Regions:
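Active-site pocket-lining segment
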Residues: 155, 261-330
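Active-site-proximal alpha-helical scaffold in enzymes
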Residues: 82-112, 158-187, 241-247, 334-355, ...
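N-terminal extracellular/periplasmic Venus flytrap/periplasmic-binding protein-like
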Residues: 11, 23-32, 167-251, 314, ...
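Short, well-ordered amphipathic alpha-helical segments that serve as non-catalytic structural scaffolds
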Residues: 26-41, 61-65, 90, 150-157, ...
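Conserved beta-ketoacyl condensing-enzyme motif
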Residues: 22-85, 89-93, 97-98, 103-105, ...
Length: 378
């Protein structure tokens, strides 16, 4: 089996919904980052482009994004939709194609524009149509599992697991503090592609305080735990990495940052989806015969502070090596892009701290978790 390596990659600054990227369609935002990745790594015609997207307009929006970037029409591009896990699963799919020998170099990651999220017109014959409205946003989890599954899932998870708002608030403060530190010290500057006029990650709040958290209203009617602060922002952004084979490295005289050791996914209760990030991570480590202490850095997409608490309870000796640059509570969560973002953050953490193994995981709408294991190339 051919080894799959990651050369590196770039991400945009993360914008808040209706923020700096408010008029930028998803395919344009993704294309701008993709162009910079191709230029940095001198790629004219990769074998594939694999991109995650959660709420894109139209079929196979990754192909539209690639063509918008000026990628040659001979290069195939396809979209992966695992909602929040789309970007990470795209990287896993790309690695598998390289493992199989089908491809030598692939650009993978994801992109999202919540600001330009498409609306859906109701068909009068559809059972959801009541005659009260003609349009709604595209649904994450239609049917029996209801629309607001992620917020409800976080609320339900907090109740089931006995998680308090105070526990979650401590993670909100940590995330913003670490993200502020990373910004002020330029710790992530090497992976930023400044596009479309953005100059910073818009969600980071340097002055986040307990006083502000105490004033936050609950977001669900009758809810006890979930607020706008301990759940992620709604965001726009894009992130891509370049994966390649050993042969490609040798032919081009390149050195990779990391080897992709493997990936896995799991299913769980769609109404308590946050736990799937932990389950996928545990499954991944067991699959590779690794223990908590073997992992130098963990990156999880903290869509909700519930996930942070679950991680700390499941991996109690790893809190200080978890989301070391802050997480989605500060940066935000541009659904399809988030897997690429946390992979890039993981690569930077391994490089800056000299760690050997790193693991990333995402919980996705619908009750799916996906996880990725990396080994730093020394």
């Amino acid at each position: 089996m051919e080894n799959a390596y990651i050369l590196g990659g770039l991400r945009s600054y993360v914008g808040v919904v209706n923020g700096i990227y408010r008029h930028i369609p998803a395919e344009v935002l993704g294309a701008e980052v993709l162009k910079q990745v191709m230029e940095k790594y001198q790629l004219r015609e990769p074998d594939y482009i694999v991109a995650g997207n959660g709420v894109g307009a139209g079929g196979n929006i990754a192909r539209l994004m690639a063509l918008t970037a000026g990628v040659d029409i001979s290069v195939p591009a396809f979209t992966v939709d695992v909602q929040c896990g789309s970007g990470l699963e795209s990287i896993a799919v790309a690695a598998a194609k390289i493992n199989s020998g089908e491809a030598d170099v692939i650009i993978a990651g994801g992109f999202e524009s919540s600001s330009t999220q498409p609306r859906r017109g109701y068909n009068p014959n559809h059972p959801d149509y009541t005659g009260d409205e003609w349009y709604s946003v595209a649904k994450f989890m239609p049917g029996i599992h209801r629309e607001t599954v992620m917020l409800e899932g976080a609320e339900l998870a907090a109740k089931r697991e006995g998680i308090t708002k105070e526990e979650m608030d401590s993670w909100v403060l940590r995330s913003h503090a670490l993200a502020t530190q990373a910004r002020e010290q330029g710790l992530l500057q090497n992976i930023i592609a400044p596009v479309c006029g953005a100059v910073k990650d818009e969600g980071i709040r340097p002055r986040m305080s307990q006083r502000l958290l105490d004033r936050m209203p609950k977001v669900l009617e009758g809810g006890e735990f979930i607020t706008a602060a301990n759940s992620c922002l709604i965001n726009d952004g894009a992130a891509f990495v370049v994966l390649c084979s050993q042969k490609y490295l040798q032919e081009h005289g390149l050195k990779a940052q990391a080897r992709v050791l493997g990936s896995t996914a799991c299913g769980g209760d769609p109404l308590v989806s946050p736990r799937t990030a932990i389950t996928a991570l545990q499954k991944l480590l067991a699959k590779h015969g690794l223990q908590e202490q073997d992992i130098a850095d963990f990156e999880l997409n903290e869509a909700f502070a519930v996930i942070d608490v679950l991680f700390a309870r499941s991996f109690p000796h790893s809190v200080d090596k978890y989301n070391v640059f802050g997480g989605a509570l500060a940066y935000g969560h541009p659904y399809g892009a988030s897997g690429g973002i946390i992979t890039l953050h993981l690569l930077e953490a391994l490089k800056q701290k000299g760690g050997h193994y790193g693991a990333a995981s995402v919980a996705a709408a619908g009750g799916v978790g996906t996880a990725l294991l990396l080994e730093r190339v020394e």
